[in-house]
Amino acid sequence: MGALLNALRQAWASDLGVQWENHFLLDTTPVIAVGYRRDKHHSDFLGSAAYGYCAARRMKYFGYKLAMLTTLDGMPYAFELLPANADERAAADEILDSLPPNSYVWSDKGFIGDEWQAQWAETGRHIWTTKRENQLSQNPPAFDQLLNCVRERVEGAFDILKEGGRSVEHTLAHTIEGLCSRTLAKISGVTLRLYLRRFLGIDVLTYTITA
């Protein structure tokens, strides 16, 4: 079922022209597997999930980290589930290879690393982030303003995954297979929403059809 759903998602994305994109948004979001204080010894997630911390939410949790690339319109391009304690850049490494050469990736401070960014730039994947205040080299103010605007798009793309029933952060799944299936379904739903709006003029949030 998962393979069929993913094939449909890729077909919708192709119809939407994802193959012509070269600007992408990169971020991660927590995916909770089991309550933080609940016993994990008999959980199906033991051995693959991990304890982690989401700085943006100031939240400790047990589960996974969803790393995802989207287009500027918020269409999912590539994604990967990793243990919650995975480094942001290690998570990104799992999906950046899927990008075509001469791609530009907009991300946040969690992905700062001059050497790491330079290594990816050599492959034609250019990663842009804001700078920390203590870094010697700083971006031009106008560029940081642009990055902040793009960051709002990143947050918007992930907010869609958290809407409605079975948020990607709380899938309520009891098995690894179930969690992966529900995560894929949620991501595919975002692509389908964009597809219906583009080709049929249907807004699935309001159930209205535009002329």
Residue ranges and their predicted role:
Residues M1-A211:
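Short alpha-helical elements
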